[in-house]
Amino acid sequence: MSLNRQLLFTYYFIVSLILFSDFVSSATLPKEEVDALQSVATALKKSNWNFSVDPCDETLSEGGWRNPNAAKGFEDAVTCNCSSVICHVTNIVLKAQDLQGSLPTDLSGLPFLQELDLTRNYLNGSIPPEWGASSLLNISLLGNRISGSIPKELGNLTTLSGLVLEYNQLSGKIPPELGNLPNLKRLLLSSNNLSGEIPSTFAKLTTLTDLRISDNQFTGAIPDFIQNWKGLEKLVIQASGLVGPIPSAIGLLGTLTDLRITDLSGPESPFPPLRNMTSMKYLILRNCNLTGDLPAYLGQNRKLKNLDLSFNKLSGPIPATYSGLSDVDFIYFTSNMLNGQVPSWMVDQGDTIDITYNNFSKDKTEECQQKSVNTFSSTSPLVANNSSNVSCLSKYTCPKTFYGLHINCGGNEITSNETKYDADTWDTPGYYDSKNGWVSSNTGNFLDDDRTNNGKSKWSNSSELKITNSSIDFRLYTQARLSAISLTYQALCLGKGNYTVNLHFAEIMFNEKNMYSNLGRRYFDIYVQGKREVKDFNIVDEAKGVGKAVVKKFPVMVTNGKLEIRLQWAGKGTQAIPVRGVYGPLISAVSVDPDFIPPKEPGTGTGGGSSVGTVVGSVIASTVFLVLLIGGILWWRGCLRPKSQMEKDFKNLDFQISSFSLRQIKVATDNFDPANKIGEGGFGPVHKGIMTDGTVIAVKQLSAKSKQGNREFLNEIAMISALQHPHLVKLYGCCVEGDQLLLVYEYLENNSLARALFGPQETQIPLNWPMRQKICVGIARGLAYLHEESRLKIVHRDIKATNVLLDKELNPKISDFGLAKLDEEENTHISTRVAGTYGYMAPEYAMRGHLTDKADVYSFGVVALEIVHGKSNTSSRSKADTFYLLDWVHVLREQNTLLEVVDPRLGTDYNKQEALMMIQIGMLCTSPAPGDRPSMSTVVSMLEGHSTVNVEKLLEASVNNEKDEESVRAMKRHYATIGEEEITNTTTTDGPFTSSSTSTANANDLYPVKLDSAYWNTRT
């Protein structure tokens, strides 16, 4: 009987398990959360989430919801918390996926979401203020393109534990409201454009364990209230903009294990009191103006792994207690005023110690040695007993006198243009002797280094090179030497005279594609002969792109045989893109050439036989005859005939596009057959052509009478060749032969937006509302790229409907960069030559030549209103009645009837909310005061519905802003005194790449001071 009971019990137990299993497996994700995930996917442009399966089913290995076998750094996971009947999404982690959307605005549909990690993607836009109403515990947006300010609403996230916003494009001040986060532990804000002082409310952040604010533009001093952060474990303040001294209150933070403060300006100060920091592992106080002796107590810290006190003014001997640091991984005392003997324990330590540029007495090392303590330039000149200030080189013997220096940094020996470049392949920091009259010293180790390939102090990568100039030897740029702190090359045996130092650079660690790996920013300083020649040098900016070569030249005089070149990292730039450990100086090659004719080396004279005079005379005569003969032949063939200035200018430029011959273009266009003419642009005629491979092209030809000249032509080539974006017209190449100046573009089937909207009836394209919305957003995205996202900061200057082209899918592409203006160094410019199209130009630009990207924003606003209305900003109903769209829109707003602007051809088939938003955005963009106009990234966010900015409120403020009224009146007087021919006006045609908007309008019409009913009623 007992056996039967036991069997019965077992049976019920198994059945219960089965029923329970079925019960648990029936747990589902609420529809509201599924819908919210779909919204998140749409915003992020996350396309591989499979909504046909359960996102919370952890047994699924496919479907895009999780990828347990992903490579290091890549994460793709949605995590749920499931009870017996229901599941809730708690974590969304999407790392290193190059997502190219924007941040999801509304997270209210995911009420249980605790973590949102979008590290290392290509997301743009701003941080939605709506996130402040969520229950998030951790937010990470590290390594994206997020711009705008940090919303104060995040201060409402009382549950927030981690906020990681490093390596973005955030600007403005830190909102004081963040000081109200009672549970905040990690706050990472490094490598943005944040400004202002650290908010005093941060004194309340007593739960902080990790704070990083490096590479920003903060002002003020490091606050004393840091003593309140009693649980702080990591503090990183490198090149933050804050000034010293380091407050003594920092000594109260006994839990610190990682302290990195570098590049502080301000007065000299003594070493901060750190005696109580017995748990310290990483102590970096570089370039902080510290004075006095090294504190002896540091030698008693047995947990220390990295000690960097470089570039200060510390003096005195190295304390005897520092012998206890023999197990420390790295010690850097570079560039101080330390003196006395170099301790024997340091000599025996090897290349993990760097004491270069100090005042030590001569040490036990008679000669410099690789893989030994780096004593390069570590002895006072008074002790070295020679003219050198390099102690371990005091016995260096020059093999001969050199009249040049050529180094293939990080690479093998090569011969380029008959010049031998020495190898530079050593892979460990420290000292290196080439045995060819030059040495080098590399200081620093890359902290938090995640690199897994190549060497730690050199890099090889030819896949990213974009060198098309045949005069540049690409082999010099396929590798590079790296340094974490400071890299020095020193020639020791140069002959006396004047030289030109050529430093060769190419950024080969970033990626040019629209991926997070191209978001890195590298900055370092360049010193020649001890003088800082360049501060905050950025290879990508100088070379106009990734993988492109640039050479910096510096004249020097050598008097004692020695030439020193030093590259130094000053704490700026990103440190974790594409991975952690990518920062600091990078150089491809060094070439130093004499500005004089060097003397011949011994043994190069003549031997017996003919006299020197006879030999020289024969050689000269033969050479002259040969030159004349060859020259005559080449002249007869036309090879030596003078080239046009344009050809000469073009030959000296390195554009990343193809070069077409005039013969190819003539074949493609049937010798510019008038039947193939499709328009008349600002440059001249535009012809359709078909290449031999079947590619359809549009050829823009610069006409002799064009108002746009050589400068604009070369400018357009330079701009477009460096830019790639879905909403910019693609430039295939160009042709420069004699006076023939041609641009070869992709052919866009649907011509211009102006032709589609308000061209001749037979050319118009019926554009429904979704098409118009798509076109408007596309234009905004293209401009946002030009202004904020491209390596170059570009102001187009001539945005209008005829400069927006439409492909076969009606995707908009911005064209005609002939008027584009680089904006590299300053945020504003006073243009000496106003160029644009009347009716689209912003008032401040039309009147004063005051050019910023806000001029493009104004022009975009006009185009946006034209898209809604379907008519040009200025069009005539009759000879006596000229219609001005901007005037009418403002009057309709005053009458609260803005939707009357909508194109009657749409009828009622349009989204009223979207239309109203587009009209308001257009009005906001055309605000008279530039400061009232939004950035284009903000415009994109508003158009896509990702921003909660109250457009109506902003518009109200801008309309009531009278600060620019006098300037507008002045502008009207200005236009009253000049002829209409002085404004850039060209006729409208039906071809692409055209300019338009010829108008008889005057300044009073286009830029009225008060846009209200009274003005409208008094117009004539």
From Swiss-Prot:
Protein name: Probable leucine-rich repeat receptor-like serine/threonine-protein kinase At3g14840
Positions bearing carbohydrate: 50, 81, 124, 138, 156, 193, 276, 289, 359, 386, 389, 417, 461, 469, 498
Family stated for the protein in its record: Belongs to the protein kinase superfamily. Ser/Thr protein kinase family.
Ranges per topology, Extracellular: 27-614
Catalytic reaction equation(s): L-seryl-[protein] + ATP = O-phospho-L-seryl-[protein] + ADP + H(+); L-threonyl-[protein] + ATP = O-phospho-L-threonyl-[protein] + ADP + H(+)
Name of the encoding gene: LRR-RLK
UniProt: ATP binding residues: I678, G679, E680, G681, G682, F683, G684, P685, V686, K700
Phosphoserine: residues bearing it: S831
